[in-house]
Structure formats: C-alpha cells, structure tokens
A protein has these predicted regions:
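Membrane-anchoring hydrophobic helices of lipid-metabolizing enzymes
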Residues: 1-120, 125
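Short amphipathic alpha-helices and their capping/turn segments at secondary-structure boundaries
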Residues: 52-58, 174-189
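Hydrophobic, well-ordered secondary-structure segments
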Residues: 93-99, 107, 168-178, 238-240
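Catalytic core of membrane glycerolipid acyltransferases/transacylases, capturing the structured
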Residues: 106-170, 206-207
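Hydrophobic/aromatic ligand-binding patch that stacks against planar heteroaromatic rings
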Residues: 126, 181, 228-229
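Membrane-associated lipid acylation/remodeling enzymes share a hydrophobic transmembrane-juxtamembrane segment
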Residues: 133-135, 187-245
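Catalytic core segments in nucleotide and nucleic-acid processing enzymes
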Residues: 164-169, 177-184, 203, 224
Length: 246
C-alpha cells in the first residue's frame, strides 16, 4: 500500500511539474513541509550536521530538505521536462560550451569534472549538452539507475554510462572505447572528481588516491583518478559546479 501510495504521489508530482514553474513548486513545498526531517533522512541529517560543524563551524543545515529538493529537481528535469528548469539547464550548458568547444577546435580532448552540488543528474545533463553532443559519465549506481528509469528522450541518446560497480573487465572495455572516442573529439568524459566516500572506502586506501588542491576559492581533496585519466588522454580538465542563483 505504501509503495503504491508513493508511486501515485510521484506521478501526481510529475504531472504538476509539467505545468508549474519548478521554483514555485519548491517554494510551496518547503513552506508546507515543516522543519522536522523525514524519517528516512533523520540519521543522515544528524551525520550531515555533525560534519558541517566539524568542517565549517556552526551553521544551519537542513539535510532532509536538500535531499528532497534534489529528488524533485531530478524528476522535474528527467520525467516532467519542466520548461523553466530545462531553460536554465540549457543556459548552463551554453556557458560551459564557451569553454569546451574552443578546446575541441584547438585539438584538445576534454574531461568534464562537475562537483557533487545541487544534483548529480542535473550536472550530468548540463555536461551532455555541450560540444560535441555526446558524453560518457563515470558514475556510481544512483545516477545510472535513475537515468535508465527515465523516459526515452534525447538525453538517453547523448549519454552513455560506465559504472564503478560493474565487472572490472567490462569497465576496462568501456573505458578503452570511451577514451578512443574522446581523443578523436567525438565525445566528452564526465567524471565527478569529489567522488563519494563509498568508492574510496571500497577501493584504494592509499593516501595517494586523494589530491589536495584549491577549487572555486576553497581547499579541496579530489580523487586522483581525474589526474591519471587526463594525463592518459592529454585532456584539459574543465571543472564546473551548479548553484542556486539567488
């Protein structure tokens, strides 16, 4: 019954998001939800608060709202094709393309490196919208599973996936073909460099697997795989990050 109710709720949300500006929808939903975290996010909310206080000091963080907002944004883009959101994503792609296309024209392969901000799905769609119009995204299971459940549209024609959870031989074959096409300027590779802790915990424990640097005016620790891949391709890494323009 609960699963059926959730499915009906998602269909209703999707139908509304096809007709309502996503910013209005988010504003109304936030006013209605109250301040208490949803039960499924409660423990992660507590961990997120502790991490924020440890790293950045005191400050308010509504983790449950951030997670819910991300899910609605993903639905608005992939399933509902919300007109306002699609326009904003196209604008972001156009900005990114001002950097990417000249690099390709100059004979330099491109490795796109979005941050884990706002939504991984939206960041991937922005990267898929730049020259030459095709990309392979190296992902964990979440983005790939979400995209495969989405309706058939141009995003699924532009994007291919290489999951870090696949069989190693399959990963090697997929990456080899992807790198060949990237070197020939037929596609970009999208890799989230601030890769989530689950990958690091289940792979290389070596300190060398992390790279200390500065990004967007802040200290950062990135997974060094982005460096190795860019060196192998002799590619230019283009970092980008989505944010809410207030």
């Amino acid at each position: 019954l609960s699963a059926a109710g959730a499915g009906m709720g998602n269909r209703l949300t999707c139908a509304l998001l096809r007709r309502v500006d996503y910013r209005l929808w988010l504003a109304v939903r936030r006013r209605l939800r109250g301040s208490r975290p949803q039960r499924r996010f409660r423990h992660r909310h507590a961990v997120a608060l502790a991490n924020r206080q440890s790293l950045l000091g005191e400050g308010k963080l509504d983790f449950a709202w951030l997670m819910q907002r991300r899910q609605w944004l993903d639905m608005a883009a992939v399933s509902a094709r919300n007109a306002a959101l699609m326009s904003h994503l196209a604008h972001c792609s156009a900005q990114l393309d001002q950097v990417v296309e000249p690099l390709h024209r100059a004979g330099v392969p491109v490795l796109l490196a979005p941050m884990h901000t706002v939504s991984d799905v939206l960041a991937t769609l922005v990267g898929a919208g730049v020259y030459p119009g095709r990309a392979t995204v190296i992902v964990s299971g979440d983005v790939q599973a979400f995209a495969r459940r989405s309706p058939e549209d141009e995003w699924r024609q532009r994007l291919d996936y290489c999951s870090i959870h696949d069989d190693p031989r399959h990963i090697a074959g997929t990456l080899s073909q992807t790198m060949l096409e990237a070197a020939e300027h037929r596609r970009n590779i999208i890799l989230f460099p601030d890769i989530t802790p689950d990958y690091t915990l289940h792979s290389n424990q070596d300190v060398a697997a992390k790279l200390a640097c500065h990004l967007f005016g802040r200290p950062a620790h990135l997974h060094s795989g982005i460096v190795r891949l860019s060196r192998a391709l002799r590619a230019q890494v283009v970092f980008y990050s989505l944010y809410f323009d207030r």
